[in-house]
Amino acid sequence: RGSPLALAQAEEVKSRLLAAHPTLAEDAVAIVVIATTGDQIQSKPLKEFGGKGLFTKEIEEALLAGQIDMAVHSMKDVPTEVPPGLGIVCLLPREDPRDGFLSPVANSLEELPEGATVGSSSLRRVAQIRHVRPDLVVVNFRGNVNTRMRKLSEGVAQATFLACAGLHRLGMADRITAPMPVDVMLPAVAQAVIGVETRLDDKVTIDYLALIHDGETAQCVAAERALLA
């Protein structure tokens, strides 16, 4: 995927691979951008088009066709079942799993003016926003991190929520007004985890990835994804 965040995550996998395998030449790991249906649909909520698999289908097709050797995903976007022959074989250490509250007019969700507009396209976030502040108006907010922050600065909404991990990876942690306590806004399953998918018969790639796999993160992700299975 070609968004700044997707590229940053791919670069993190590449840098960890090169660090773990000093004999591996830098040009031995090339990043290939593949546009997904989910990236191209910006005007409507994803639930109208089939949900999370929209961010993985084209990438997995390229993996099965042998056009790429590994696929880098945000694990929160990966369906609980992956296509036969593929597997999530590597998970990087988890970043901050919390959602970040961003607003130019308030220091917290509770401090937003009555009837304020909040931008979000996430059913999970919208449900929890309305539980805490049923008076707020929620508008659809699609797009990558930069697009959503631009909409916020243009006044399309007075607040929005973005994953803290994504902002950290983009070097934009200073844009977070306040991290949301997990007992107020529960993060998505496997939020803040980068996963690497490959063909299960590609033992060479699996062996390379084994050195950057984080077992503790894998246990957490397995437990969380089991709730969705």
Sequence positions of predicted segments:
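Small-molecule-sensing regulatory modules
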Residues: 1-35, 40-41, 46-49, 56, ...
